[in-house]
């Protein structure tokens, strides 16, 4: 009996050593495997589960189909939808940031809460631009400055840091502001202050991909300001292929808009700027809208000569 047991024990030891060797050669994290498997299964749903969402897509409230931009011509062509990422591109000096600030003011008038992560401009300068846009004059009085701040109280937040910042910090700021402050609109100005090297294509791809995931998972809209490559002649507007850095930026964003300052003489009464929508993943329209810049930094679609006061 003892000899038989010894033989069995030897065999067991040999099998155990063989098993350990196999596991060492081909490590498997079963817990991670099962967790991922369960998650994937949970994400596979029958079409009928989306009944209410589909009804809302066609017949829901206007807000469910997106928020309006400041220009009524775009009401049924392009809207700002939660869960999406928009790239606002253009040449240096063509007022991309100013346009995005004007858009943010309109979104806040519709009940949204915004956070500006401007790594190129101090908060007081950002607020100066937005105050003139909200009041409709380039030099608002102290009373109107107070009225402007009252109108954005609890709606507008600014991240007070300039210069280069690590991507992880941007992710953390967005997540905190969305979950703890209820912020739904984020402006990041600009990409080059987060991913420093123009040829760091993998870094740009990872950053933009993560922003897209955050917009979707947190149900917010992220506005990312990027730069178009410099040209000797900037009289022709840039396109998607002119975006600085990785081509994956344009591939990953939901919407791609180009802000272009129209080259013209000072006495030309025509429009001063155009916004070209070159990509809209969840909409059919692509095209452009002509705008007139007012001294208050408002952008009008009809050549309006006077500024409008919104406070």
How would you name each of these model-derived features?
Residues 3-16, 27-33, 45-46, 171, ...:
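C-terminal regions of RecA-like/P-loop NTPase motor modules
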Residues 119-121, 220, 224-227:
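Conserved H-loop
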Residues 103, 125-130, 173, 210, ...:
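Alpha-helical scaffold elements adjacent to nucleotide-binding pockets in ATP/GTP-utilizing enzyme cores
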Residues 183-224:
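Helical hairpin unit composed of two closely spaced alpha helices linked by a short loop
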Residues 2-21, 28-31, 52, 65, ...:
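Conserved inter-motif catalytic segment of the P-loop NTP-binding fold
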Residues 86-88, 115-117, 157-159, 223, ...:
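Hydrophobic/aromatic beta-strand patches that form the interior of the parallel beta-sheet core
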Residues 35-137:
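The Walker A/P-loop phosphate-binding site
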Residues 1-82, 150-153, 214, 288, ...:
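Core recognition of P-loop NTPase motor domains used across DNA-transaction enzymes
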């Amino acid at each position: 009996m003892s000899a038989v047991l010894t033989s069995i024990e030897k065999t067991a030891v040999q099998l155990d050593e063989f098993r350990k060797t196999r596991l060492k050669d081909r490590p498997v994290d079963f817990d991670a495997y099962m967790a991922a498997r369960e998650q994937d299964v949970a994400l596979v749903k029958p079409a009928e589960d989306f009944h209410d969402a589909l009804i809302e897509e066609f017949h829901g409230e206007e807000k469910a189909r997106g928020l309006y931009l400041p220009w009524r011509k775009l009401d049924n062509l392009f809207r700002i939808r939660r869960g999406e990422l928009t790239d606002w591109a253009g040449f240096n000096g063509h007022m991309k940031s100013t346009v995005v600030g004007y858009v943010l003011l309109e979104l806040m008038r519709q009940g949204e809460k915004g956070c500006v992560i401007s790594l190129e401009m101090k908060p007081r300068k950002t607020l100066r631009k937005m105050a003139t846009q909200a009041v409709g004059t380039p030099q608002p009085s102290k009373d109107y400055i107070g009225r402007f701040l009252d109108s954005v109280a609890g709606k507008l937040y600014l991240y007070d840091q300039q210069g280069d910042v690590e991507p992880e910090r941007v992710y953390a700021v967005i997540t905190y502001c969305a979950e703890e402050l209820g912020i739904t609109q984020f402006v990041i100005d600009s990409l080059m202050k987060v991913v420093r090297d123009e040829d760091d294509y993998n870094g740009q791809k990872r950053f933009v991909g993560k922003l897209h995931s955050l917009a979707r998972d947190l149900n917010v809209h992220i506005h990312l300001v990027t730069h178009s490559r410099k040209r000797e002649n900037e009289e022709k507007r840039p396109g998607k292929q002119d975006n600085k850095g990785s081509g994956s930026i344009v591939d990953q964003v939901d919407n791609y808009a180009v802000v272009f300052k129209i080259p013209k003489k000072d006495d030309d009464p025509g429009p001063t700027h155009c916004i070209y929508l070159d990509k809209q993943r969840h909409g059919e329209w692509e095209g452009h809208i002509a705008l007139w810049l007012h001294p208050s930094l408002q952008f009008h679609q009809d050549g309006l000569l006077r500024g409008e006061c919104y406070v």
